[in-house]
């Protein structure tokens, strides 16, 4: 893992969290219990404090950064999709930020909300509970349905289960030269296949 002290501040990572070895955590970063931090994630606590609360996940290639005297927060059971950028914002409890979305300074995403993939949330946006936000700039189009929230929670549970799976079996290795006979397929712990 790449952990760096900065001006006397050392990242804090709960022992039950999983941080991928290629992720980088710098300075004032606090990672809670059962959190998943994916490959190539960058959490730069060299200006403001970054807080990832219990059960949240920060997926591959995500960036978290902030500015002085502020906290950038991902709330409990927050779900941050691949490639998302969070800058000086607050993501509410049980909210989802879709892949490659950008959430700007001072924005607040309400709890149980969903930000659609590729959305841009402007600085200072103040969201309410359980909103579906879509677009560039993002706007609330309706409330998140019970089915959508259930789907989000199943996906978050997959990442919470992945923490233990990674602790138990993830290790660096050399690649095989060919596919072995009867190669098994990996299985998740819940069925999160998108409905068409």
Curated annotation (Swiss-Prot):
Could you confirm whether the keyword Transferase appears in this record? Answer: yes
Task: Name its GO BP terms in alphabetical order.
Answer: carnitine metabolic process
Keyword vocabulary terms for this entry: Repeat, Transferase
Q: Which CDD domains match?
A: LbH_paaY_like (cd04745)
A GO term for molecular function: transferase activity
Q: Known SUPFAM superfamilies for this protein?
A: Trimeric LpxA-like enzymes
Pfam families registered for this protein in UniProt: Hexapep (PF00132)
Q: Does the keyword Transferase apply?
A: yes
Region annotation (Disordered) ranges:
173-196
| Highest taxon listed in the record's lineage | Bacteria
Report the sequence similarity comment from the record.
Answer: Belongs to the transferase hexapeptide repeat family.
What this chain does, per the entry, is described as: Overproduction of CaiE stimulates the activity of CaiB and CaiD.
The molecule here is called Carnitine operon protein CaiE
Species whose genome carries this gene: Escherichia coli (strain ATCC 8739 / DSM 1576 / NBRC 3972 / NCIMB 8545 / WDCM 00012 / Crooks)
């Amino acid at each position: 893992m790449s952990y760096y002290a900065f001006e006397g501040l050392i990242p804090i990572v709960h022992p039950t969290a999983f941080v991928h070895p290629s992720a980088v955590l710098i300075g004032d970063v606090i990672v809670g219990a059962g959190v998943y931090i994916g490959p190539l994630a960058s959490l730069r606590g060299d200006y403001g404090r970054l807080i990832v609360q219990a059960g949240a996940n920060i997926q591959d290639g995500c960036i978290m950064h902030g500015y002085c005297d502020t906290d950038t927060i991902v709330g409990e059971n927050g779900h941050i999709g691949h490639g998302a950028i969070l800058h000086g914002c607050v993501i509410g409890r049980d909210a989802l930020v879709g892949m490659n979305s950008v959430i700007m300074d001072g924005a607040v995403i309400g709890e149980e909300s969903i930000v659609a993939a590729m959305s841009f949330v402007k600085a200072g946006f103040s969201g309410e509970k359980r909103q579906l936000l879509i677009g560039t700039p993002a706007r609330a189009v309706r409330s998140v349905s019970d089915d959508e929230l259930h789907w989000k929670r199943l996906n978050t549970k997959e990442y919470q289960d992945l923490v233990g799976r990674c602790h138990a079996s993830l290790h660096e290795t050399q690649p095989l030269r060919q596919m072995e006979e009867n190669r098994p397929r990996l299985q998740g712990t819940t069925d999160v296949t998108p409905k068409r």
